[in-house]
């Protein structure tokens, strides 16, 4: 229209869209100013103040490590949380989330030591802790900037840091309450141990990677017998110095098997064939041996001067090996349990750095993994090695050093999983939590069912000290409720540094004496708490208590947190509250590259949310991308997918721009009453009502990808392709104050406002920009989701939908005419529409309305003798495109019967132009 109208004397009378709303978003440059406006206007605080007294919704933020900048996975996590809080607020809830940061622990300490380089050896513990605190503080600031740049709402004076004195005091306090209630004990048990970092690891700090281990079959001589042995299989030869027994299963059948050399070996009947296949040693069964007979056997250790005993345990299976399990209670959980039942002390001749101690003098000072070849050679020299090969398997590694871990028995502090029926109570509570996706309950149940006691202590510098003391006179450990409460108060006032700056006597209540010997001389312990305990007590430190229900409505983190934060939060809450800390747990998958590989700097396949997305496209594009994902599964992303999302954003923006342009000169105050609106506009308001209802339901169900799909479809098809096309003539060519134009403008106003509010949680900048461009004074975030149920009109929808079935047939018929160069604009056409079931469309809708719906000049039930330009049909309708004989109106381009000659205006346009 525009090119023709440049030469058209009536072009100035046509009400073309007019708006200052820019076509080019320029998000990267313009968003920062809006961020500052939100902050200075305290919009997030006002959102909550406006909804005080409403139903509360609390999303508890799982604290990321204050270590490095946010990566793409972080951006997904934080943006989804922000979408949830904003959508809940717009839905009328008092919605709140306090962002937090995990500030203690190995991730930060290791990075600081790495930054120090050679100076690390010269750096004392006090200076190291100071550097760790400064490092964490620096990245809390940087990540906070990222959070704002993601267009997330948060209050900078309402955050939590696990290294703040108040939080540290709460950690000590909760530890004390757990101790007081019998859930915490000190014991010597095998735990995952990092020989690189010289500290214990919890289950949540373990990652499994492929690892090649030696696979050996070893003969243990039976005491008092000649040429009779028990055959064991192990992939950890270095643990053999700690062997105290061989474990069998009473449900498995065992026998003596003779080899070609005449030796007899005890092994499980069900594994004899497998052993022969692996070792190449022929085995012939000699006789069976019962469990009672096995129980009295004793075995000579292969190279230590001691006896190994028979043990029994259900963990022994026929999955691999010989059915006779080498047992070192100091180097394995199952080994420890069966050893404990038999009265064996856990024995581990290995120090903190993985070197043998003087309890194994033959290899004292040698690292355990380095000792494997020498132990194998020792067995070979003694004639006790039946077979040796290499074995690749999944093996536990440290999450920080990425190096293999060992099991090692050391004195540690533990949380009792089975005290006071806690495990059973927790499993029951898990069933009452909503897990999204639903498979989350199976995953966490399986972990909770089998998890060993939680090792709470660590042997590092940067963390909250366990307030335990040792009597210098008798060596008794001293810790009680009074001393913990005393220390908690000190930490609340001065932070954990007081543990290191003050003497033991000053950290204990006056008059404290050893409960065993009465001495008043103590020394401080060296253990700190597991960093997972820090974040695990965050529901106590951050959230308010609710009567008989969890303090948080929602936890949302990556699916790896089923073994991490979801559990570390669950145990203290169940122990002290008797209920879980969360009502609902929602998880997301990993963010991978487009080939399904993990993103990493070394592979060069990473996408930086700031440099690669925000600085190029803007944060609204990043947020729209997040909303497009079904984040419950792992997510593949490449730069091409971001480009596609940016193109979809452009379509949404153009929809907003078209709405604003057509509302030039029309305000909400000029809206017509509902009962005065045209049927076509009422029909599309009814469709808007259904769209809004669906979107709000999708927000409620955290199905943001469904919103993305519906939004694109609504903007590009329902509005741009259909409704805007239908009302273009009315909006451009009817008189500004005509009832028909005002009816459509009223509908457009409602559509614009509704779209603005519905998209605000996702497209936060754009929605606010549109809201202001529409003349609104307050923020879009201070509105509520509209309740448009009264616009829902089923009868009207059925009437229009029955007619719109033919629109697709009409458009195909028109396209055929265009392709054959018989037609330009659709307004140059008339139509003959025949329903094959005899339905008369003009009985459903007036002829004038049909012309608007199909954007043509005339609609006929039967061709009045006009030339046929094209034809198309389907099983329901046939359509002929006709060439009107009437002259075209030079202003609106319609061919109407009230035009007498070329160049004259139609009656409608005459009345408008005057």
Curated annotation (Swiss-Prot):
Cofactor binding note of this UniProt entry: Binds 1 zinc ion per subunit.
Name of the featured protein: Isoleucine--tRNA ligase
Cofactors: Zn(2+)
Lineage of the organism: Bacteria, Pseudomonadati, Spirochaetota, Spirochaetia, Leptospirales
Disulfide bond annotation, renumbered to this chain: none
Residues that hold ATP according to the record: 601
Summary of subunit composition and partner proteins: Monomer.
Annotated L-isoleucyl-5'-AMP binding sites: 557
């Amino acid at each position: 229209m525009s090119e023709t109208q440049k030469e058209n004397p009536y072009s100035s009378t046509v009400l073309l869209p007019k708006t200052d709303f820019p076509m080019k978003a320029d998000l990267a440059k313009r968003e920062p100013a809006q961020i500052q406006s939100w902050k200075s206007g305290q919009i997030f605080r006002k959102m909550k103040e406006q909804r005080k007294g409403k139903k509360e919704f609390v999303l508890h933020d799982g604290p990321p490590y204050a270590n490095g900048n946010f990566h793409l996975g972080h951006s997904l996590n934080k943006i989804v949380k922000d979408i949830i809080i904003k959508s809940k607020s717009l839905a009328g809830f008092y919605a709140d989330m306090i962002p937090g940061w995990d500030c203690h622990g190995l991730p930060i300490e290791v990075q600081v030591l790495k930054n120090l380089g050679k100076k690390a050896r010269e750096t004392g513990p006090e200076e190291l802790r100071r550097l760790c605190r400064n490092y964490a503080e620096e990245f809390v600031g940087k990540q906070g900037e990222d959070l704002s740049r993601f267009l997330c709402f948060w209050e900078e004076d309402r955050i939590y840091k696990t290294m703040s004195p108040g939080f540290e005091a709460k950690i000590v306090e909760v530890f004390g309450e757990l101790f007081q209630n019998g859930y915490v004990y000190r014991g010597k048990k095998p735990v995952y141990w990092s020989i690189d970092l010289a500290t214990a690891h919890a289950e949540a700090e373990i990652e499994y990677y492929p690892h090649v281990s030696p696979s050996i079959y070893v003969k243990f001589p039976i005491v008092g017998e000649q040429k009779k042995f028990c055959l064991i299989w192990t992939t950890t030869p270095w643990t053999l110095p700690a062997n105290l027994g061989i474990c069998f299963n009473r449900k498995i059948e065992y026998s003596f098997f003779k080899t070609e050399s005449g030796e007899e070996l005890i092994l499980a009947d069900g594994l004899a064939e497998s052993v022969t296949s692996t070792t190449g040693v022929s085995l012939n069964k000699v006789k069976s041996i019962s469990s009672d007979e096995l129980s009295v056997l004793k075995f000579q250790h292969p190279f230590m001067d001691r006896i190994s005993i028979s043990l029994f345990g259900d963990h022994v299976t026929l999955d691999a090996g010989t059915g006779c399990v080498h047992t070192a209670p100091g180097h394995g959980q199952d080994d420890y349990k069966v050893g404990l039942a038999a009265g064996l002390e856990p024995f581990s001749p290995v120090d903190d750095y993985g070197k043998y101690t003087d309890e194994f003098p033959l290899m004292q000072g040698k690292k355990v993994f380095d000792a494997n070849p020498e132990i194998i050679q020792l067995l070979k020299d003694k004639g006790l090695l039946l077979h040796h090969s290499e074995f690749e398997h999944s093996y536990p590694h440290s999450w920080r050093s990425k190096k293999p871990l060992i099991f090692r028995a050391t004195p540690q502090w533990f949380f009792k999983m089975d005290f006071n029926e806690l495990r059973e109570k927790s499993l029951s509570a898990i069933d009452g939590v909503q897990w999204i996706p639903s498979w989350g309950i199976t995953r966490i149940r399986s972990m909770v069912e089998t998890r060993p006691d939680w090792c709470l202590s660590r042997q590092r510098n940067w963390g909250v000290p366990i307030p335990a003391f040792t009597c210098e006179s008798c060596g008794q450990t001293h810790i009680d409720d009074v001393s913990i409460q005393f220390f908690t108060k000190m930490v609340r006032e001065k932070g954990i540094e007081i543990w290191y700056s003050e003497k033991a006597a000053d950290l204990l209540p006056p008059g404290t004496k050893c409960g065993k010997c009465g001495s008043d001389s103590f020394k401080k312990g060296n253990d700190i708490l597991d960093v997972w305990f820090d974040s695990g007590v965050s529901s106590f430190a951050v959230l308010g208590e609710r009567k008989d229900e969890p303090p948080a409505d929602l936890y949302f983190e990556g699916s790896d947190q089923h073994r991490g934060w979801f559990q570390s939060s669950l145990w203290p809450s169940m122990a002290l509250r008797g209920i879980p800390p969360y009502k609902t747990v929602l998880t997301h998958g990993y963010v991978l590259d487009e080939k399904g590989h993990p993103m990493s700097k070394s592979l060069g396949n990473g996408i930086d949310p700031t440099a690669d997305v925000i600085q190029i496209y803007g944060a609204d594009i990043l947020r729209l991308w997040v909303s497009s994902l079904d984040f419950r599964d792992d997510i593949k992303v490449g730069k091409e997918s971001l480009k596609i999302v940016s193109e979809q954003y452009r379509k949404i923006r153009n929809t907003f721009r078209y709405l604003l342009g057509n509302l030039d000169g029309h305000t909400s105050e000029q809206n017509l009453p509902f009962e005065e609106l045209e049927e076509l506009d009422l029909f599309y308001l009814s469709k808007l009502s259904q769209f809004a209802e669906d979107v709000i339901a999708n927000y409620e169900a955290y199905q943001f990808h469904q919103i993305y799909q519906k939004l694109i479809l609504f903007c590009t098809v329902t509005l741009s392709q259909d409704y805007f096309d239908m009302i273009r003539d009315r909006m451009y060519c009817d008189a500004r104050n005509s009832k028909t134009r005002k009816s459509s403008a009223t509908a457009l106003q409602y559509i614009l406002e509704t779209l603005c509010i519905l998209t605000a949680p996702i497209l936060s900048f754009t929605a606010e920009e549109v809201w202001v461009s529409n003349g609104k004074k307050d923020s879009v975030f201070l509105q509520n989701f509209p309740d448009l149920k009264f616009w829902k009109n089923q009868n009207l929808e059925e009437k229009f939908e029955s007619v719109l079935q033919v629109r697709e047939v009409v458009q195909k018929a028109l396209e055929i005419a265009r392709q054959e160069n018989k037609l330009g604009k659709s307004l140059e056409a008339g139509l003959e529409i025949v329903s094959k079931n005899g339905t008369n469309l003009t009985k459903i809708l007036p002829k004038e309305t049909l012309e608007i719906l199909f954007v043509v000049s005339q609609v006929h039930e039967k061709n009045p003798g006009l030339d046929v330009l094209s034809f198309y049909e389907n099983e329901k309708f046939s359509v002929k495109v006709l060439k009107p004989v009437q002259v075209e109106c030079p202003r609106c381009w319609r061919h109407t019967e009230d035009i007498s000659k070329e160049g004259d205006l139609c009656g409608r346009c005459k009345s408008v132009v005057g």
